[in-house]
Amino acid sequence: MKIIWLGHGSFRIESGEAVLLVDPWLNGNPTLPEDQHDAAVIGATHILLTHTHFDHVVDVLPLARLLKVPVVGQYDLMGYWSEAEEIETVGFNKGGTVTLNGVRVSMVPASHSSTFTTPDGLRSGGSEVGYMIAAEGHVVYLSGDTGIMADMDWMGDYYKPDIGILSAGGHFTMDMQGAAYAAKRYFNFKTVIPCHYRSFPILEQSAQALIDGLPGVEVIEPQVMQAIEV
């Protein structure tokens, strides 16, 4: 399995015949160089969406049309988009699991918000969510934008993820100290990858507090477009 950070909260996850783009943000993403846009999305088979804030959703519909791939996400929004936007979608809900080209993806709760702007005004984007992604003997917990929440207790116990991709930039999500607390209290990660940081001045610029807070855990500070192989 390859995990490739596309900057901010965006990822490309490759496993076998599956190439999953998670919250792909290209245009306006200050951490993803423009000359890397094509390489970031080429060969994608699915787009996973955690919620509909602009820095996660702005490129989802254009990419779905360009790449001719389905968008996978929360049932209510996917139902709306399949009709209003005439794109292929895979809608499911928290607790549910879908298999995408051999990769099992389970939807889990997050604690955030999810709205987007339409010509008619602000619209609910359904529930904000995270994902447990199981492939090649690993379970990856992709938190999406979230704060610390009690649901992490059963999520860690039930899915037993060994890799955590945690939003940890602060202000809108957990900060590095909070992510370290959540990882220690609720999970038994072998590897942690922070995200949703280093993109805006208001967000944390270093993962040092996460590294210091998780002795014995491999904390990987991702570099944009560099594959992490697990």
Swiss-Prot record:
SMART domains noted in UniProt: Lactamase_B
One Pfam match: Lactamase_B_2
Family, similarity comment: Belongs to the UPF0173 family.
Protein name: UPF0173 metal-dependent hydrolase SPO2976
Organism annotation: Ruegeria pomeroyi (strain ATCC 700808 / DSM 15171 / DSS-3)
Keyword Repressor included in the entry's annotation: no
GO molecular function, one term: hydrolase activity
Keywords: Hydrolase
